[in-house]
Amino acid sequence: MNFETVIGLEVHVELKTKSKIFSSSPTPFGAEANTQTSVIDLGYPGVLPVLNKEAVEFAMKAAMALNCEIATDTKFDRKNYFYPDNPKAYQISQFDKPIGENGWIEIEVGGKTKKIGITRLHLEEDAGKLTHTGDGYSLVDFNRQGTPLVEIVSEPDIRTPEEAYAYLEKLKSIIQYTGVSDCKMEEGSLRCDANISLRPIGQEKFGTKTELKNLNSFAFVQKGLEHEEKRQEQVLLSGGVIQQETRRYDEATKKTILMRVKEGSDDYRYFPEPDLVELYIDDEWKERVRATIPELPDERRKRYIEELGLPAYDAMVLTLTKEMADFFEETVNKGAEAKQASNWLMGEVSAYLNAEQKELEDVALTPEGLAGMIKLIEKGTISSKIAKKVFKELIEKGGDAEKIVKEKGLVQISDESVLLKLVTDALDSNPQSIEDFKNGKDRAIGFLVGQIMKASKGQANPPMVNKILLEEIKKR
């Protein structure tokens, strides 16, 4: 029997507001434990929540960017459960009247575009953070308690773990572009739970789903889903029954492990939050927020193709993160040719960032510096090989490309008399290479060029070297 995989994702995104959703407590990441909290966050008796308007507008902005319908009447509800990181024994969330519904985004997998529906986007408060010491006790930090977040629930439209990865990449990109969150998984500002079930191909009814947690990266989401997909298939093929449960992905064992039997919404005993009135969002407010939405990745991608003449692949890679797209655009604005700027950002820059595990904001390279170096290549002042030395200096120490070239004596040698001597020396030292070339071995030219570049410390002008070399060989 063959099965179809059905996947839905629940993504929690912390909003980048200056204060918490129901109190004036600040929300910086990395503060000393339990220093960014208040009696409201901790649910002391007699205190009342006050809704943060900026959090509402950030949620609206995110929902609009995800093509959601924005509610006119919305409200908050209490989600009741006991856990050490939940001091009130309930969480203020939204149940039956979310702020956004019926959205969608488009993903691209294997060269094909697919629309993934978004069931809802609702606003809620985050919980505290537990740290398990391994010594028989746990520590709880309530700094995160009350931080505003949105939960974005996809439709069960995802059919493969690869599609799930693409969906998360696209969702993160859109949210980052809006500016409502930095979406840093390593800081907990983006978290994902995945629901997965299998059903016989052709069957409309969904199978029993399991929820996956402990997914610390998009790669873990994909791997966890791949392993859970195999586990469920093995259970079903052996005549077993899938239980509705919560499991976690363990990277060490490459397996999903049972955590607990999955709760349903009835277990949370939702009821309307009595300390907050219903929220009315009129058309004027909606349009005011909509006007703040910047150019989103798909729009920018289209512009790069149509106006800058970039290949579709380049445009897709560059617009994946707002940071990279902004850097590229500023580099072009400083005079660099668009395709050359794209090549450097997708090549040397990305390779360096990946190797050093850094972001663009962490390095000294500036758009001015990169543009200056590209212009020196275009003018023939430096070769592509020399440019790599200049690039290393720019990305590690910053500065002006032209100044670096002059100070380090890296100007490309284009003087014909100097190049002629280099060519003559190489030919005199390698007579066999001349014979090899004349006998049809084209690789001999590559060897000779390499010798000349070595002698010039990479500074000889390659096109001129090739031209002079061929002319001199003909004379011998």
Swiss-Prot record:
Root EC class: ligase
GO biological process: glutaminyl-tRNAGln biosynthesis via transamidation; translation
Source domain of life: Bacteria
Disulfide links within the chain: none
Enzyme Commission number(s): 6.3.5.-
Pfam families the record matches: GatB_N, GatB_Yqey
Entry GO MF terms: asparaginyl-tRNA synthase (glutamine-hydrolyzing) activity; ATP binding; glutaminyl-tRNA synthase (glutamine-hydrolyzing) activity
Catalytic reaction list: L-glutamyl-tRNA(Gln) + L-glutamine + ATP + H2O = L-glutaminyl-tRNA(Gln) + L-glutamate + ADP + phosphate + H(+); L-aspartyl-tRNA(Asn) + L-glutamine + ATP + H2O = L-asparaginyl-tRNA(Asn) + L-glutamate + ADP + phosphate + 2 H(+)
Keyword annotations from UniProtKB, A to Z: ATP-binding, Ligase, Nucleotide-binding, Protein biosynthesis
Matches recorded under Gene3D superfamilies: 1.10.10.410, GatB domain, N-terminal subdomain
Subunit structure: Heterotrimer of A, B and C subunits.
Main function: Allows the formation of correctly charged Asn-tRNA(Asn) or Gln-tRNA(Gln) through the transamidation of misacylated Asp-tRNA(Asn) or Glu-tRNA(Gln) in organisms which lack either or both of asparaginyl-tRNA or glutaminyl-tRNA synthetases. The reaction takes place in the presence of glutamine and ATP through an activated phospho-Asp-tRNA(Asn) or phospho-Glu-tRNA(Gln).
HAMAP family linked: GatB
Entry similarity comment: Belongs to the GatB/GatE family. GatB subfamily.
Protein name, per record: Aspartyl/glutamyl-tRNA(Asn/Gln) amidotransferase subunit B
